[in-house]
Every structure is written in C-alpha cells, then in structure tokens.
Amino acid sequence: MIEINDNRLKTAKQFGVDHTINSLNEDPIDAVRKLTNGKGADKVISANPSTQAQAQAIFMAKRTGIVVFFGGVAKGALTELDTNYIHYNGLWIYGHYGSNSMQVQKSFELAISDEFESEKFITHILPLSEINKGISLTKSGKAIKVVLHPNDQ
C-alpha cells in the first residue's frame, strides 16, 4: 500500500498489508520495482484524487499488467500519461466508478462477517454535535473513520 499518511499505513498493517510505502519518504515507483525484483505489480489500483499518483501508477505495473483508476481526481484536472509506455508494455488501463449489485452484496457479506474487523477502521467516536471536529479529523488525515452518535452529548 502506498500512502502519504503514516497513520493510514499503520492501520493498513493491522489488516494484513504485506508492504507499506510512504511516498513522501521514498519514490513509490522504485519501491514497487524493488519489491517485485524489477518486474512491477500484476495489478495497480490508484484509489486517490491525485493526478501524480495516477501518472506514477502505470510505471508500477508489470508488462501486460493492469492499472485501475478508482479514485477520481478533481473535475477538470487532467492526468498526463506516457501512452508510449502504456502501448509498448501492453498495459490494460481501466477506470472504475460505483459498483454493481453483486459487488454490493459481496461487500455487505464481508462487512458483517467475523473475518472483517471493521472496528479497526474506527479511530474516533464523537457526538453528533461535534460533526465539524469529525470532518476536520478526517480531512487532516488524523482519522480513518469517524462514527457520530446522534443522541450523545
């Protein structure tokens, strides 16, 4: 997992992520290439609103690999991609938005299963009256998920 927030990387480890890379501290392309003995990853999912991350993602994939742009960037923001690299390395590029009914069902089943420890995502529990604090914590990256209780003070 590649992230710029150390708290999120630490949380990812709790869910069994094998490798974490803070892209503020090291070049993510070099790090992925090193982890894969120079080959690149089979699949790369860019799930963030960064055009830079999208541009970097293609260089993390192996020849004939798959790159998925899951997180949308700001409206009007354009990502510059090296289409020569994409073409000559036979990369498959997909954009993904939303989900179908089967994906929703599988997600629901996972979320309620004993295998998925959803409470690990919850970093803050606040009363509804502190909604602005919850938003600030999330925007600043200090919170993973905030739960708001409507009847608490």
Role assignments for model-derived ranges:
Residues 72-90, 104-109:
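Rossmann-fold NAD(P)-binding glycine/threonine-rich loop
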Residues 50-51, 73-75, 153:
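Short glycine-rich anion-binding loops that position phosphate/pyrophosphate groups of nucleotides
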Residues 5, 73, 99:
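Residues in the short beta-alpha loop(s) of Rossmann-like NAD(P)-binding domains
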Residues 1-56:
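Adenosine-nucleotide cofactor-binding segment
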Residues 55-59, 101-153:
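C-terminal hydrophobic helical "lid"/dimerization subdomain
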Residues 61-63:
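Helix-to-beta-strand junctions that scaffold the AdoMet/dcAdoMet cofactor pocket
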Residues 65-66, 144:
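Glycine-centered, small-residue-biased loops immediately flanking beta-strands
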